[in-house]
UniProtKB/Swiss-Prot annotation:
Belongs to the complex I subunit 4L family. This is NADH-quinone oxidoreductase subunit K. InterPro entries: NADH_UbQ_OxRdtase_chain4L/K, NUOK/Mnh_C1-like. GO terms for biological process: ATP synthesis coupled electron transport.
């Protein structure tokens, strides 16, 4: 087994571990909206890691381009998500999802 396949294997194990931790964070803690946002960002990090690993394995630059666009979208998503959380906190004085029901008038 050469060194490139070992590094790809380790990278994929790391990426899978990140993805499983983020899914566990979403499943275990559904009440805190900030932890949900962080878990979603961790999931996007796992996907970015996969893109970089496979792009490096096939010597393609497009993987890096995809990662750049995913990071830009993730930054915009985080900014909008945090702005919504701050607005909800200012109005309701809580970020606990079980106490928030914005569909009721």
């Amino acid at each position: 087994m050469n060194s490139i396949s070992v590094s790809v294997t380790h990278g994929l194990i790391f990426s899978i571990l990140l993805f499983v931790i983020s899914v566990a964070g979403i499943i275990i803690n559904r009440r805190n909206i900030l932890i949900l946002l962080m878990s979603i960002e961790l999931m996007l990090l796992a996907v970015n890691t996969n893109f970089l690993i496979f792009a490096n394995m096939h010597q393609q630059a497009m993987g890096g381009v995809f990662v750049f666009f995913i990071m830009a979208v993730a930054a915009a998503e985080t900014a909008i998500g945090l702005a919504i959380v701050v607005a909800i906190f200012r109005k309701r004085k809580t970020i606990d999802l079980s106490k928030l029901n914005t569909l009721r008038g």
